[in-house]
Amino acid sequence: MLSMTGDGVNDAPALKLANIGVAMGITGTDVSKEAADVVLADDNFATIVQSVREGRRIYDNLIKSIQFMISTNLGEIVLLLVAVLCNFEMPLLPIQLLFINLVGDSLPSLALSVDHAAKNIMSRKPVEPNQGIFTKPFTTRITRQALILGGVTIAAYLIGLQHSIEVARTMTFAVMIFSQFTMIFSIRSGNSWFTERFFSNRWLWATIVLVMGLTLLVMLVPAMQSLFKLTALTSIQWWIVAGLSLGVLVLSEFCKLFTRNNN
């Protein structure tokens, strides 16, 4: 990947042939500006560095949002597929799935799109121009997250099923949403989530508070419980929900550590 800067007529051929031609906005000639891909408005080379940093941040956030959306939806598919194959009653009803997809998936994904840049973002090698999004490492991460999410929700369903189908669905519903909160922190960083600034994304935290509030409203208010076909949980069942949800983060971080050590 080669970038070329120039401001004169004689620079036009090089600007045209470079992967990214950068012309000077103040001192550059019209010919150089026409030949370039980018015009540097302030003629400050430091702006190029900031532009590269911002471009990498946008690309990273796009990847994280896609990974989160696909992982959560595949996790739901794993849950429903296992239920069908094992001839269980449906672990989640259509209205519950609708709430999970519209509230639990979409809002956190939007918040990820405005996440801050990773600490090592400028020390990485550039992405190949012809490289697609669905690379082998990316596909592996999605599959891993989906299996983890599907596994903990299946566990919640089986535990709740010992009491009643209503309890099973309520626990599955809660674990599916709360697990996404913990999973999103693992997705934010390719390294350990402890290395990232935990409270740096205010939009993400605002989204988590909003989604958690709406979820608790649906689960605790009798009228909303009736609408969403949920039931009240005991304190022990709530602790199980919390433990399984945190288990997603623990398993995800362990898998990342294992992958880094192998690499």
What are the roles of these predicted feature ranges?
Residues 152-156, 210-226:
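Hydrophobic alpha-helical transmembrane segments in multi-pass integral membrane proteins
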Residues 121, 206-207, 238-241:
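Multi-pass alpha-helical transmembrane bundle typical of ion/small-solute transporters
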Residues 196-205:
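Cytoplasmic-side transmembrane-helix entry/capping segments in multi-pass membrane proteins
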Residues 1-12, 16-20, 62, 84-87, ...:
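Cytosolic catalytic headpiece
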